[in-house]
Amino acid sequence: MISKIDKNKVRLKRHARVRTKLSGTAEKPRLNVYRSNKHIYAQIIDDVKGVTLAQASSQDKDIANTSASKVDLATTVGQEIAKKANDKGIKEIVFDRGGYLYHGRVKALADAARENGLEF
């Protein structure tokens, strides 16, 4: 009998494999994306110090009150994380898609962050 593939387990293995090659510094921190079925989260992380520099999610008060589609919420989260990064003087980042395909909500977040001043 063929067992069913656990997609999240495969994603976590892919993410771990990529993270060995991908790291953020103070000059060029890492933009990490986590996507659940209902929400999307983004963090800008300095891996050298192990510190989160900025974060935004679809559960933030100003974002969660809008009744929009999940892709629209991801776009808003991308705009918000870019605004917070610009306030802290962060212009360049390393994009970590978290093992997810660069499509849909992850792509919408990345495109919105690029349009609002982040370079990656």
Swiss-Prot record:
Report the SUPFAM superfamilies cross-referenced here. Translational machinery components
- Indicate whether Metal-binding appears among the record's keywords: no
Recite the UniProt keywords alphabetically: Ribonucleoprotein, Ribosomal protein, RNA-binding, rRNA-binding
Q: What InterPro entries does the entry give?
A: Ribosomal_uL18_bac-type, Ribosomal_uL18_bac/euk
Q: Which domain of life is it from?
A: Bacteria
Q: Which CDD domains match?
A: Ribosomal_L18_L5e
What is a GO molecular function of this protein? structural constituent of ribosome
List all membrane-crossing ranges: none
What Pfam families would the database entry show? Ribosomal_L18p (PF00861)
**GO biological-process terms attached to the record:** translation
Keyword S-adenosyl-L-methionine listed? The answer is no
List cellular component terms (GO).
cytosolic large ribosomal subunit
* Coiled-coil features, chain-numbered ranges: none
Assembly behavior: Part of the 50S ribosomal subunit; part of the 5S rRNA/L5/L18/L25 subcomplex. Contacts the 5S and 23S rRNAs.
Q: Indicate the family of this protein.
A: Belongs to the universal ribosomal protein uL18 family.
Describe its function.
Answer: This is one of the proteins that bind and probably mediate the attachment of the 5S RNA into the large ribosomal subunit, where it forms part of the central protuberance.
Full protein name = Large ribosomal subunit protein uL18
Please report the organism this UniProt entry assigns to the protein.
Staphylococcus epidermidis (strain ATCC 35984 / DSM 28319 / BCRC 17069 / CCUG 31568 / BM 3577 / RP62A)
